Amino acid sequence: AEAEFTGHMLEVTLGPGMLSKNYDGLQNDLDKMDGVFLKRGQYTYPLDKERVWHFVPLANVGDKVQASAWLGQVNENFQPLKIMAPFTMKGTATVKTIMPEGDYKIEDTIAILTDEEGNDIPVTMIQRWPVKRAMTNYKEKPRPFKLLETGVRVIDTLNPIVEGGTGFIPGPFGTGKTVLQHAISKQAEADIVIIAACGERANEVVEIFTEFPELVDPHTGRKLMERTIIIANTSNMPVAAREASVYTAMTLAEYYRSMGLKVLLMADSTSRWAQALREMSNRMEELPGPDAFPMDISAIISNFYGRAGYVKLSNDETGSITFIGTVSPAGGNLKEPVTENTKKVARCFYALEQDRADKKRYPAVNPIDSYSKYIEYPEFEEYIKGHINDEWIGKVNELKTRLQRGKEIAEQINILGDDGVPVEYHVIFWKSELIDFVILQQDAFDEIDAVTPMERQEDILNMIIDICHTEFDFDNFNEVMDYFKKMINVCKQMNYSKFKSEQYEGFQQQLKELIAERSIKQ
């Protein structure tokens, strides 16, 4: 059979009915397909044409509208979704007719617009958009500044990510990338979660398909799946579909951002997406770049990350796409092209480390190598001063300095032995261990410790900083070790107790008594 050209780029179909769906990289609905493998040339329509939606008009006859203006609203899984003017429309149009409130199918015409040349444009609930073209249907794209709470202390306290920010998580096999992603997608303050499982092993994708529907959304108490879309492309699916899957996910995210929603997009893993780019480029006999990746790999990655962000829409509402990608470098080598180029464009870097995972210090994020460039943004500083307190960033920087100092002293103790360094050094080392055990380490399987709200994180931070500023009196290093182990135990018990409960305050009292035992009164 001959190939026919449609004259269209690879496009996705956008409309109500996409939430809680499982798609492949070309937006085929996987739940409608049978069998273990996808059959050749098998396509399914991504939306349900028969389902009826309750439409409420938002625009009036005679209104002047531009592309992606909100014309009406439908509710999907309690999430209000906007029906918008066609994204491809040029200039300004006038609303000629709009349907009254009622029940309609996605292919029914719900409005007719008249463009500047007098042509009528019928509008249904469906939009089509090419995946590789970024949607620029917003008024401006300011620098993001709002803290995105994830409930993970090592992220929120030490290296915060913002609403509309970009981050990436590199890490070798078995360091807990997926658990960390699950925690973020479950706990982060987002309206819509999109997961692109791109080039994952089939068993990992099955795990996502079986585990995600079971997760309960802590914000609403309902199933997390109700506001999630999963795009799955296992390693044995076609290379071209694997390349497209990440773009498909980003296009769906941009569609929801145009409605003024906060979207969290997770890609797991962008390395396999880059490998698909490499295979395509090699087959097309393009010039190979470093490690045989395409020459323009850095431009492709930065263009893609550039599509995320915080935007102001034409009606002054705001929407955002927060993008977190994992990178699985071969052999844990962080110097390969994908990691290097991602590092240039992503503003947050959460380095997962085999050594911390082996010591069971989860989440295994290395606090010294990881960073967040948002801490340096004056807009972010203003936001923190207004929403948390003025001294927050100073205290966070002090924590990082203490962790760095603790690491240096640990190396000295390793070389010189416990007796070879002064007792004060042991105190500095154990203060850094206290920060590690109480702030950085978190139990994802404990109901209370898994999610730490910002108010509680502030409380923990102030408590630990006060202990770090206290001077203690010890005679030898054994006393230091025993004393701080007791202290870590009490603080850990506090982390497992309900905030401000009787149990919590009991441990707080124990901690005060413990500090009073050894502290030198100023």
Where are these regions (language model features)?
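N-terminal accessory targeting/assembly segments
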Residues: 1-39
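Short, surface-exposed secondary-structure boundary micro-motifs
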Residues: 2, 8, 27, 70, ...
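Residue-level signal for pocket-adjacent positions within structured domains
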Residues: 5-7, 25, 42, 48-50, ...
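P-loop NTPase nucleotide-binding/switch module
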Residues: 33-76, 81-88, 93-95, 105-165, ...
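P-loop NTPase catalytic core
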Residues: 157-158, 164-488, 500
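C-terminal amphipathic alpha-helical interaction region
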Residues: 475-522
